[in-house]
Regions:
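Canonical tetratricopeptide repeat
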Residues: 80, 151-152, 185, 219, ...
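Residue-level recognition of tetratricopeptide repeat
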Residues: 40, 74, 145-146, 179, ...
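Alpha-helical segment of the N-proximal tetratricopeptide repeat
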Residues: 37-66, 70, 114-133, 137, ...
Length: 495
């Protein structure tokens, strides 16, 4: 299923065999103990893990909630609900409350479980150094636990360290060849590094292991779409829905595919159908943003403004800070009036500074990309004072959080500013750290062209022409690639 919309709580599914056993597994087995006072709670937990393994998130969360009702001190069940990742099914306030319950129960569980709670809590609250320390300690204590090995690999992947995650997933697959979840993530990692041959081979193994589940078909469809094979992707999305008509993420995938194909009215109709079956207000807002991006693809910026403002208004009513801030940030990205763009970015930052039940790391990461946008806009408009001041603010945020996502935002911002200053070699060093962002890759093309490196410029231009991920950044770059002559509708990012 799409990594951008659904959460990675399936990481805990790897431990379902462990949790079905005794309350605490022997330390000498190298397996993480599990503590709960309720056998029915454990059964619900295990059932939820199986559902998460197959990415049936809302149903899994129902099981976890029932487990917590039976045992409020069930630390791992609580920390699962709070796990800070790309989670469209759990509202921010619920994550915070679940994390607090997990920490309140720490004194009643094993040392290993305490380390897992510390690891995920510190990560969620933006304290990356102690998070890594807890992760390393628990992985060292339980080297045979495939749950922890899997969780570590997914956590690294979530930090945007794809090349580091690949060997971790490969090791997990080698140790447990019949265990499906690592194959899913490994295939995505291969696809994101443009190794589609390995991605397709790995995904075929995943489908073979789970022939009656929707998610393998959904994941295969997304990777086909990433490779530009849109019609084949639609076939597999529909195969997923045939297996489970309620697997709404495949409906979302159909919408994303039509958006990338250029059929924006059809995409909006498909997004509306997905939104109709969304399981949370967060999903409604996030998918509303995706639908609004279709107007950017059509260069109907008035339509985009209206759609983004509608999402921002609804998100504000529902106390969803990140989608509201994203809506303002997205609007800023295509404005031709620099003052208007900066005003929208100021609104986005103000939303994030308000009091919300929001994990600290989530707030920091969204703030980082808002600041990144401000640096790029100011640098492009020749406002070097604002660009430098904002870049300093972003650098301090990266240094204080040790958050890889924030660091990548800083490198993207620094690279953009340096390109505008004509410091191309220095810019390329920073931009290479943000090479999963089409806008940064586009800046790299400019830098290579300016330095006379036509081979690298052409290689990256070809990469951008085949960049098939349904993001705003991709839409902006695609508009530049396909509409160079439409000066009146040019975004400042499309240059």
């Amino acid at each position: 299923m799409p990594r951008n919309y659904f959460f990675r709580l399936a990481v805990f599914a790897v431990c379902c065999g462990v949790f079905a056993a005794a309350e605490t597994a022997p330390r000498e087995q190298g397996i993480l103990p599990i503590t709960t006072k309720s056998a029915p709670a454990r059964q619900l937990f295990v059932g939820g893990l199986v559902k998460l393994q197959n990415l049936h998130g809302p149903e899994a969360l129902q099981d976890f909630h029932k487990a917590i009702q039976l045992d409020p001190d069930f630390a791992l069940a609580n920390i699962m609900i709070s796990f800070e990742s790309v989670d469209a099914a759990v509202d921010p306030a619920e994550k915070v409350a679940a994390r607090e319950r997990a920490n309140a129960a720490k004194s009643k569980v094993s040392r290993g479980e305490q380390l897992v709670v510390d690891w995920l809590t510190n990560s969620s609250e933006g304290r990356m150094v102690p998070a890594i320390q807890s992760m390393n300690e628990v992985l060292e204590q339980y080297p045979k636990d495939k749950f922890l090995a899997w969780l570590g690999a997914v956590w690294v992947e979530n930090q945007q360290q794809i090349t580091r995650a690949i060997p971790m997933f490969e090791r997990e697959v080698a140790l447990n060849p019949d265990f499906a979840p690592p194959l899913n993530e490994l295939a995505y990692c291969y696809a994101r590094t443009r190794n589609f041959d390995k991605a397709f081979t790995t995904m075929q193994r995943y489908i073979t292991l789970l022939p009656n589940e929707s998610n393998p078909q959904d994941s295969y469809a997304e990777i086909l779409r990433m490779a530009g094979r849109f019609d084949e992707a639609l076939v597999h999305y529909r195969a997923s829905l045939k297996i489970d008509p309620g697997f709404v993420y495949s409906q979302l995938g159909i919408a994303d595919t039509y958006a990338l194909k250029g059929d924006e009215p059809r995409a909006r109709a498909e997004y509306a159908l997905a939104i109709l079956h969304a399981s949370s207000k967060t999903e409604v807002a996030t998918w509303g943003l995706q639908s609004a991006i279709t107007y950017v693809r059509e260069q109907d910026f008035a339509g985009a403004d209206a759609a983004f403002r509608a999402v921002a208004s609804q998100a504000h009513e529902n106390d969803l800070a990140v989608p509201e801030a994203e809506a303002y940030r997205f609007m800023a990205s295509y404005q031709t009036d620099g003052a208007k763009a900066l005003d929208l970015l100021k609104k986005a930052e103000a939303v994030l500074q308000e009091k919300h039940s929001l994990p600290k790391s989530t707030q920091q990461q969204e703030l980082a990309v808002v600041l990144r946008e401000r640096v790029a806009r100011a640098a492009h408009d020749g406002n070097n004072e604002l660009a430098n001041a904002t870049l300093k603010q972003l650098h301090e945020l990266a240094d204080s959080t040790h958050n890889q996502v924030v660091q990548i935002a800083y490198d993207g911002a620094a690279g953009a500013a340096l390109v505008e200053q004509g410091k191309y070699d220095e810019a390329l060093t920073h931009l290479a750290e943000d090479n999963r962002n089409p806008i940064s890759v586009n800046f790299m093309v400019r830098a290579y062209q300016k330095t006379g490196d036509k081979a690298h410029a052409d290689e990256l231009s070809q990469l951008l022409a085949n960049w098939n991920e349904p993001t705003l950044e991709q839409a902006l770059v695609a508009a530049e690639l396909h509409a160079h002559t439409n000066e009146s509708a040019r975004s400042f990012m499309r240059m």
